Amino acid sequence: MFDYLENEEVVLDELKQMLRDRDPNDTRNQFKNNALHAYLFNEHCNNVEVVKLLLDSGTNPLHKNWRQFTPIEEYTNSRHVKVNKDIAMALLEATGYSNINDFNIFSYMKSKNVDVDLIKVLVEHGFDLSVKCENHRSVIENYVMTDDPVPEIIDLFIENGCSVLYEDDEYGYVYDDYQPRNCGTVLHLYIIAHLYSESDTRAYVRPEVVKCLINHGIKPSSIDKNYCTALQYYIKSSHIDIDIVKLLMKGIDNTAYSYIDDLTCCTRGIMADYLNSDYRYNKDVDLDLVKLFLENGKPYGIMCSIVPLWRNDKETISLILKTMNSDVLQHILIEYMTFGDIDIPLVECMLEYGAVVNKEAIHRYFRNINIDSYTMKYLLKKEGGDAVNHLDDGEIPIGHLCESNYGCYNFYTYTYKKGLCDMSYVCPILSTINICLPYLKDINMIDKRGETLLHKAVRYNKQSLVSLLLESGSDVNIRSNNGYTCITIAINESRNIELLKMLLCHKPTLDCVIDSLSEVSNIVDNAYAIKQCIKYTMIIDDCTSSKIPESISQRYNDYIDLCNQELNEMKKIMVGGNTMFSLIFTEHGAKIIHRYANNPELRAYYESKQNKIYVEAYDIISDAIVKHNKIHKTIIKSVDDNTYISNLPYTIKYKIFEQQ
C-alpha cells in the first residue's frame, strides 16, 4: 500500500480496498512514514479526497517521520510537488491548526500557485511570521524575491507582523553570510531579484510592488553596505520604466551623488553607474532618463559622474553637456576646476555649450592639488589674467599653492638657483606661479590677515618660492595685521635658518629686524636665529644694541660685544683709502674689493682668520682674489694680441676686463 501511495496514480476505490487490510499508521518502514507521508510525497499528489480518506481512516496527521517532518511539513517541503490549497486545508483542519507552523511557507512561496486565501488562513490561525529560512532571511524578504510577488500578499505579511523597517536592536545576528542592514531594505531585495527576466514566469520590476513597499514606510533613499540605493540597482535592469525610476527617486535629494568604490576605485553612484557601460545593461543611453537625473542632481555629483567617462565616451558626454542649461554647466565647470587633472578638450566642450572661464573658475583651479602650468596658462589666457589680482574669500589666490605639497611635487631650493627657464621640468608649481606673476599687478598685495605671498611662502617653508618672490620684488618689511614680519614667521613657525638668511640677504630695514626680534616667542630655543638677526643689525648700525629688546640684549650681551669688537676692528683697518668694513659690507665696496687683492693689509687680515662671527668676510675676500687673478691672466694674454687694447696701460686694461 505504501509503495502504491507513493508512486502510483491513486484511485479511491483501490485505496479503500487496501485500507481494509493495512494499517495506515504502520511506520515500520525505512523512513518511518505513515500513509499520509507516503501519498504527500507522490509527485501526482493532487487529490484532496485521497487525503480525506486517509484522515478518515485514522492516519495520524501529527506523526513525524525520520526527518522529524509531519505530513504537512513533508508535503510543503517536497521539491516536486505543487502545494494544493485544498489538501493543505484538509491537513490543517484535521489537527485544529495545531500543525500550522509545520507548514513550510518558504518552499510554498517559491511555487507558481501561491494562493492568497491560503496565506490568509495561515495568518488568521497564528502562523509564526517571524520564522527565518536557512539563509536567515525573513518571510517577507524571501517573498519579494520570488518570481512575481503580489502586493496583496505583501500587505498581508507586513500587516500581520513581518517587519520591513529594521531597528538598531534587531541586528543581533551572529551569521557572517547575512545581516539585514548589509543587504539594504526589502525594496533592495525586490529590485535586485527582478533586474532581468530569466524566464516567462519571472516578472520585471512592477510599479505596484514598488509602491506597496514604499507605502509601508521603506525609504527609497536607504543604502546597503555597498552604499547603493535601490534605484542604483534598478538602472542596471534590462527593462527600465521611467515611472518606476521616479518612484525610486523619492527622498533622494541628489540623484547625481557619487562616491569612490573601495573595491574597484571607480566613481559610483546612480548617474555614474548609468552612464558607465560596465554597469548599464542596455547599450544605448536613454537621454530622457539622463535629463531626469540632471534635474534632480547637484553640480558636483554631475561633474564627478561624467568626467571619468569623458575619455572613453566623448560622444555621449558631449550630448549630455549640450542638454544642460548654461547656469548648471557653469557650476559644473567650476566644480571641475578642483577635480584633478584637467582635460582641456573637456573644458573646451563646456565652453562651446555656454560655460565661461571666469574669476571663480580660476580661483577654484588654484585649489586643485594637481595644478599644472600648461592648464594654468590656458585658463589665464581665456580669462584675461585679472583673476589673480582679486582675493578669493579674503585669500590671495596664488597663495593656495603654498599651503601643501601638490601631488608628488615639492619645492626644491636649487630649482630657482638653476634658473626659471628649466623650472617647468623640475617643479610644476613654481612654473605655474611664474606664469601667474606677469598678470599680478602688485606682488605685495595683502590678504584679509594683512599677509603677502611672501608671508605664506615663508610659513610653509617654500624656499624656492621665497627666492622667486624676493627676486620679483617682494617686500621683506611688510607687517601683517598681528604685527608679524616674514622674519618673525621664519623664526617662530618655519624654524628654517636658510629661509631666514635668504630674507636677511635682501636687506630688511633695521626697524623690521628689531620689530621681528620683539615678536620671537622663545629666545632660548631660537638662539641661532636670534644671533643671525643681531649679527645683521650690528652691520647696519653699531648703536643697535640699545634698540634690541631688553630680554634679548641681556641674554646675548656677550655675543653683541663680540660683534662690536669684530666690526670695530674691521673699521680700523685701512685698505687703499677704504676701511675693511666698507669693502666687505657696502655695495660700493663689493664692486672694488678685487682691486685690492694684493694689498698687504687685506692679505694680512685674510690670512689671520681672526673673526668668530663675521667669517663670511673671508669668503668675500677669497672671491675677490679669484676675480683679481682671473683679470690679471686675461691682461697677460692680451699682451700678445695685435690690438689696440694690448698697447693700453695696465690700469686701463684692468678696468676694461673687470667689466666682463
Curated annotation (Swiss-Prot):
GO terms for biological process: symbiont-mediated perturbation of host cell cycle progression; symbiont-mediated perturbation of host ubiquitin-like protein modification; symbiont-mediated suppression of host NF-kappaB cascade. ANK repeats lie at residues 31-64, 101-131, 135-166, 190-222, 226-257, 268-302, 325-359, 449-478, 482-512. It holds the Pfam family Ank. Keywords: ANK repeat, Host-virus interaction, Inhibition of host NF-kappa-B by virus, Modulation of host cell cycle by virus, Modulation of host E3 ubiquitin ligases by virus, Modulation of host ubiquitin pathway by virus, Repeat, Ubl conjugation pathway. The keyword Repeat applies. Residues 578-658 are annotated as: PRANC/F-box-like. The keyword Repeat applies. PANTHER family: ANKYRIN REPEAT-CONTAINING, PROTEIN HOS4. Substrate-specific adapter of SKP1-containing E3 ubiquitin-protein ligases which mediate the ubiquitination and subsequent proteasomal degradation of host target proteins. Prevents activation and subsequent nuclear localization of NF-kappa-B in infected cells, by targeting NF-kappa-B RELA subunit to the SCF E3 ligase complex. Interacts (via N-terminus) with host RELA. Interacts (via PRANC/F-box-like domain) with the SKP1 component of the host SCF ubiquitin ligase complex. Belongs to the orthopoxvirus OPG023 family. This is Ankyrin repeat domain-containing protein OPG023. The lineage of its organism: Viruses, Varidnaviria, Bamfordvirae, Nucleocytoviricota, Pokkesviricetes. The gene is OPG023.
